[in-house]
A protein has these predicted regions:
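Sec-dependent N-terminal signal peptides
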Residues: 3-16
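Domain-terminus/edge residues, biased toward the C-terminal soluble/receptor-binding domains
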Residues: 180-184, 192-197, 201-412
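Active-site-adjacent loops and short helices of periplasmic peptidoglycan-processing enzymes
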Residues: 2-6, 22, 26-214
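Conserved, single-site charged/polar hotspot
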Residues: 15-20, 312
Length: 412
């Protein structure tokens, strides 16, 4: 028995030195075998190919843009890159930066918002704030989203940015980050100011960003009536589509002498979320008619088809050279639905491209493969499959400890 144990121990020592030699060579060479997994993030592609030119819609406005909220696909456009004032639709960016401040912990919905002399002197639509008066951020957001209050927008801008000019700098920086190439903000509320310009396409980008990132904004934009000051101040939503159009959820209206009458309207039906931007309409009724025409077209021409995640998809992959044997997979990048033409008869399928194993180290969130979304044989989009946990590389000390524990078990 002692001879047998001795032989096993010797064999273990030999294995150890062979392991150490191999490990040391791999480390010393500075070379790593590349995993067959995709090494860079797969960017989602346009999920729908428009098969035909859209019809010429009669739109009583200077510019318009209709997009799918999920993908950003442009479904219809009219002078979408023509710069013009956008009035109170400007407040969408003010709201976006405010929700970001809440998300980052800078503010809460209960944070008191002071009213400065500057905010007090705002013209246009307002709730007649008085200097020194305070409302919670939640109340100010109601005033902005429901009544389009300029004084409330400026007061919030001063709270978030320290001053309105500093906040406007943040607005322009954020617009640049979003790719709003033809937008320049000069104030936080949208009053006509020289150089305060945007486009229908840029407004669609801005609207999509806040709706996808902070859908809680719809809690405010969907309010028809409310009150402030203990019921003394009545708020009535400027977006009359809330009462006229099935599925409308928001988002923001705007009217000035320079901009005309405008709206960025969001609506959802049967899982399809659309954003219709109308700029420079001659009247309020024209604004709502144009938005209705755009939304009607979008809901009639397109549908949201459910994306079927394969039932036999791998839930984990093996990892070589790690303390972890496997790493779980994350398919969250795949959308729940995909945009298709309404008449499309093709069935959606998902084709996975994954390696048999990964090479350590693997970090959580790392792209390890991709999922192709197909409609028939046509590729509708590509999405990353990611690691859902870390799998660190096994270092020499860990390997030695594991081998020692194994030898002790054999000797025992």
């Amino acid at each position: 028995m002692e001879r047998k144990n001795l032989a096993l121990l010797c064999a273990g020592v030999v294995c150890f030195w062979l392991f150490a030699l191999a490990f040391g060579t791999a480390q010393g060479s500075g070379l790593r075998r590349q995993s067959p997994a995709v090494q860079t993030a797969v960017q989602p592609q346009g999920p729908v190919q428009l098969t035909a030119e859209p019809p010429a819609l009669e739109l009583p406005c200077r510019a318009a843009c209709l997009i799918d909220q999920q993908t950003g696909t442009v479904l219809y456009e009219k002078n979408a890159d023509q710069q013009m004032p956008i009035a109170s639709i400007t407040k969408v960016m003010t709201l976006l930066l405010t929700f970001e401040a809440v998300h980052n912990g800078q503010l809460t919905m209960d944070t008191p918002v002071p009213v400065s002399e500057h905010a007090y002197h705002m013209g246009g639509s307002q709730i007649w704030l008085e200097p020194g008066e305070q409302f919670t951020l939640d109340e100010m957001l109601k005033a902005i989203c429901v009544s389009s209050a300029n004084d409330a927008a400026v007061a919030v801008a001063e709270l978030v940015g320290g001053s309105e000019p500093a906040f406007v700098q943040q607005m322009n920086a954020r617009a640049a980050e979003l790719g709003m190439e033809h937008t320049t903000f000069r104030n936080a509320c949208g009053l006509d100011t020289e150089g305060h310009l945007s486009t229908a396409r840029d407004v669609a980008i801005m609207s999509r960003t806040i709706l996808n990132t902070y859908p809680e904004v719809l809690h405010y934009t969907g309010i028809w009536t409310d009150t402030l000051r203990g019921g003394a101040t009545q708020l009535v939503n400027t977006n009359k589509l809330l009462r006229r159009y099935s599925g409308i959820t928001g988002l923001k209206t705007g009217t000035t002498s320079g901009a005309g009458v405008c709206i960025s309207a969001s609506a959802t039906r049967d899982g399809l979320n659309l954003i219709a931007v109308v700029l420079g309409a001659p009247s309020s009724s024209d604004r709502f008619d144009a938005a209705t025409t755009l939304l009607d077209y979008g809901f009639a021409a397109y549908r949201a088809a459910p994306v079927p995640l394969p039932e036999d998809r791998p839930l984990q992959l093996k990892v070589k050279g790690s303390t972890e044997e496997t790493v779980p997979l994350d398919y969250a990048a795949l959308p729940a639905t995909a945009l298709l033409p309404a008449e499309s008869a093709g069935q959606l399928t998902v084709q996975l491209e994954l390696p048999e194993a990964l090479e350590a180290p693997v970090t959580r969130g790392q792209t390890v493969g991709k999922a192709q979304l197909l409609c028939g044989e046509a590729v509708q989009g590509e999405y990353p499959v990611c690691a859902a946990a870390d799998a660190p590389r096994m270092d020499f000390d860990t390997a030695l400890q594991l081998l020692w524990d194994s030898l002790r078990g054999v000797a025992a």
